[in-house]
Amino acid sequence: MSLATAQAMGQDDDNFYKDKTITLTVGITPGGGYDQYGRLLARHLFRHIVGAPTIIVRNLPGAGSLTSVLTLAKIAPTDGTQIGTFNAGLLNDSMTEGDQTRVKFSQFSWIGSMTRDLRVCVASKASSIKTWDDLASGKDAVFGAAGANSNSANGIATLRNLFNLDHLKIITGYPGITETNLAVERNEVDGTCASWIAIPDGWVRDNKVNVLVRLSPNTLLEIPSSARYIGDIADTPAKKDIVDALISSSELARPFIVSDKVPPSRVAMLRKAFTETMADAEFLADAAKSRLLIDPVDGGAAQKIVEKLYAMPPETAEKVRAILKN
C-alpha cells in the first residue's frame, strides 16, 4: 500500500462517522447488568470517536444472547456502525461445544470489555438453603437462569456437576436476569447465580438472600465473608484446573465486539475510543453513580484472551464441556 493510499484511507475514516448512527445491540432484556453497561457506554463513547456519531441502544435478546451474536455475524452492517454486547457465558459454551454453538468468538473483532466479572450464587431466605454446606449436604434446591448457555446457567451447572449435587435443579429460559431475579423474589425458584452488580441492592442489605458461593477469586467488602470461593471448595488438582478454565472467560465480563469484516483501521478507531472512554472522568463519575464497576480490558488484550481460550487443550475442554452440561 502506498503512503498516499494509506493517507487517503485515514482521511476517509476520519470523516466516516460524521452524521452516522451506531447501533449498540444488547443481547439481553432491559434492566440487567449487560443492559446497564451497554447504555453507560453508549452515553459516553461517541465523544471519543472522530465525527461524534449518534449511538442508539437496541435490546436483542434470545437464546442466551446467541440471537444477537448471530445477527452481528450474519446480518449487521460490516462498516463499523454496529457494535454488540452479549452474555459472556457464550464464551465458555463456544470454546467447548465447537460448531454446536454456531459461533466462534475469535472470529470477531474485539473492542474491549468494560470490567472483569465478580459472580456469586445466592439463595432466598425463604428456601432451606442458608449456606454452601446446606447445598453440599444434599438439601433439594431449584435455581433459575436465563438461556441454557448463559453465565447464570453455567454457574449453576458448575456447582451441580463439579461437586455432584444431583439434587440441585436448573430451570432455564428466563429472558434475562431481571426476570430471573423476579422469580427468586416470588419464590418460583430458590436462588440463582449472577454477576454481583446484577444482584438487587436490597437483597443483601435487607437480609432477603444468603450469598452462598463466589464464582470469582476477587471479592468486595459488601460481599459476606461467609461466601466461599469455588476454587477453595474444589478439593482436587483436576477440579481446580477446571475452575481455572471456567473463570478465565470472566476476564471479559462485559464484552463488546464488531464483525470481523469491519475494516481494521475502523476497528482501531473504535478500540482507541473505547480505551479513552474507560479513562474519561465524566464516564467514570456516571459509572460510580450507577454502581457499575469499571475494570477494563482493551480490545487487543481481549482478542488475545479469546484466542488463548480457543487454544485450550482438548482434554481440558472435554472436562469443561461435561461440567457445563445442564
Residue ranges of predicted features:
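N-terminal signal peptide c-region/cleavage motif recognized by signal peptidases
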Residues: 5-6
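Hinge/capping helix and adjacent helix->loop/strand transition within the periplasmic-binding protein
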Residues: 16, 22, 47-52, 71-82, ...
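A ligand-binding cleft/hinge motif common to bilobed small-molecule-binding domains
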Residues: 88-100, 153, 157-163, 186, ...
